[in-house]
From Swiss-Prot:
Classification via NCBIfam families: lipB, PRK14345.1
The protein's name in its UniProt record: Octanoyltransferase
Protein's UniProt keywords contain Transferase: yes
Stored HAMAP family: LipB
Family (UniProt): Belongs to the LipB family.
Length: 232
């Protein structure tokens, strides 16, 4: 069974470094068998974080501070209105990190379907995507949830960031996840009404429990070619 812990939303958002220390402490407890599998759900004050594969050109050009972290993926933003989830869970044998990422994607895709939003995986790209339209009217993929993880001693850290009611202008200063031919979006933008992290938590909880309590099951949601690839 997976324990879902909501630790800071809205005005009670948790600074990124403080949350990282909580992750590390809980990771050590799960590794040692002192704690059960847990997902931490929270919001952060505005911050940029860069995974191990971040390129210099991905970063803000104006010297805005960036926190470098030991997760996979590249640079992204966290801040008010975005729901962040940190699953600290023991993976089954044989170890399959990609399958863990796919399970997180499945939980988020199921949540979006419950909200009436069609979303998908995109071939060769992690996260959850919505087929949108660029300013020039051409089709493009728009990321609504980013995923980046780390695994040590078979136990995961880091996780996902789901854009709910956050503004999107912070992404204009970076190359989100290092992907130049796609956009970003949010649940509120897609639905045309405000959907906050607090609104999402009770809906997401059962999808996370289902996905992460059945670690040996492979997800079935197919990946689609990128919109950019389809135009090529």
């Amino acid at each position: 069974m997976v324990d879902i812990v909501v630790t800071g939303l809205s005005a009670n958002s948790v600074p990124y470094i403080e949350a990282l220390e909580r992750q590390r402490a809980l990771h050590a407890d799960v590794v040692a068998g002192r704690a059960q599998d847990t997902v931490i759900l929270l919001e952060h004050p505005s911050v940029y974080t860069a995974g191990r594969r971040t390129e210099p050109d991905d970063r803000p050009r104006d010297g805005t501070p960036v926190i470098d972290v030991d997760r996979g993926g590249r640079i992204t933003w966290h801040g008010p209105g975005q729901l962040v989830g940190y699953p600290i869970v023991r993976l089954p044998e044989p170890l399959d990190v990609v399958a863990h990422v796919r399970r997180l994607e499945d939980a988020l895709i199921a949540l979006l379907a419950e909200l009436g939003i069609a979303s998908c995986r995109v071939d060769g790209r992690s996260g959850v995507w919505i087929r949108g339209t660029a300013p020039d009217g051409t089709p493009r993929d728009e990321k609504v949830a980013a995923i980046g993880v780390r695994v040590a001693e078979r136990v995961t850290m880091h996780g996902f960031a789901l854009n709910c009611s956050n503004a999107l202008d912070a992404y204009d200063r970076i190359v989100p996840c290092g992907i130049r031919d796609a956009g970003v979006t949010s649940l509120s933008r897609v639905l045309g009404r405000t959907v906050t992290p607090a609104d999402v938590v009770p809906l997401l909880r059962p999808h996370l429990v289902r996905a992460l309590s059945n670690g040996s099951a492979m997800p079935a949601t197919p990946a689609l070619p990128s919109a950019a690839g389809a135009r090529a």
